[in-house]
Amino acid sequence: MSKSLKKLVEESREKNQPEVDMSDRGISNMLDVNGLFTLSHITQLVLSHNKLTMVPPNIAELKNLEVLNFFNNQIEELPTQISSLQKLKHLNLGMNRLNTLPRGFGSLPALEVLDLTYNNLSENSLPGNFFYLTTLRALYLSDNDFEILPPDIGKLTKLQILSLRDNDLISLPKEIGELTQLKELHIQGNRLTVLPPELGNLDLTGQKQVFKAENNPWVTPIADQFQLGVSHVFEYIRSETYKYLYGRHMQANPEPPKKNNDKSKKISRKPLAAKNR
């Protein structure tokens, strides 16, 4: 196995190949792959389906990376040096064990797609500059532990896809209404009871748009609209009646629905998703 990894490194260097695929090789430490960090010319590195628990600071030496895929490992932390990958456009960290992101993570000036699905992240995991990632077009935060989506989400004005499925969200900030380029919003499987009226600023009811919101404990008026269809929900939350009811609801500060501690739904998806990317 190690010989074939060595050969991959040598071939990439000799033939100046920009893409290196080391997925599903049983790698537990990137430093064990001799010569990997000398491949400063590569633009794509795939290390999905391995046994990595950390990413070494040397990652910064791969300064031309545009695509970096760590999907389905056991990574618990990232080095601050990851933010020096100034050309990185696509970062997949889905299905790992991250409960925090490093300081300065938000200074990736070219990042367009960030996949953090199935980790242990919450609103407290995000560094102060996370929402400086203003080039993001797709942000996947499903299957984490978010109870609150920070209002700074509104700064990510280029977002077209936002996936928040299966978290513990008890509310959405009004700033979500500033994401006017959004084409897909996934909020199913949370603890949401109401929607901010500002969500009505978005067009998520067309044939090319996706709005998924099932498995939430909606208040009765919203649940009734969902029975009629998504376009009815959006029509309703734009109404003056709803804005008034929403204001009353928020003033009353009701107790949020109980947390769903049954994470078996999350765990059961893991083996199914393991080979899908």
Swiss-Prot record:
Protein's UniProt name: Ras suppressor protein 1
Example of a GO biological process term: intracellular signal transduction
Gene3D superfamilies found in the cross-reference section: Ribonuclease Inhibitor (3.80.10.10)
UniProtKB keywords: Acetylation, Leucine-rich repeat, Repeat
SMART domains, sorted: LRR_BAC (SM00364), LRR_TYP (SM00369)
Annotated Basic and acidic residues bias: 7-24, 256-265
Disordered: region residues: 1-24, 250-277
Pfam families, alphabetized: LRR_14, LRR_8
Modification sites for N-acetylserine: 2
Organismal lineage: Eukaryota, Metazoa, Chordata, Craniata, Vertebrata
Function statement: Potentially plays a role in the Ras signal transduction pathway. Capable of suppressing v-Ras transformation in vitro.
LRR repeat intervals: 41-63, 64-85, 87-109, 110-133, 135-156, 158-179, 181-202
Database matches in InterPro entries: Leu-rich_rpt, Leu-rich_rpt_typical-subtyp, LRR_dom_sf, LRR_domain-containing, LRR_R13L4/SHOC2-like
Disulfide bonds: none
GO CC terms of this entry: cytosol; extracellular exosome; focal adhesion
Source domain of life: Eukaryota
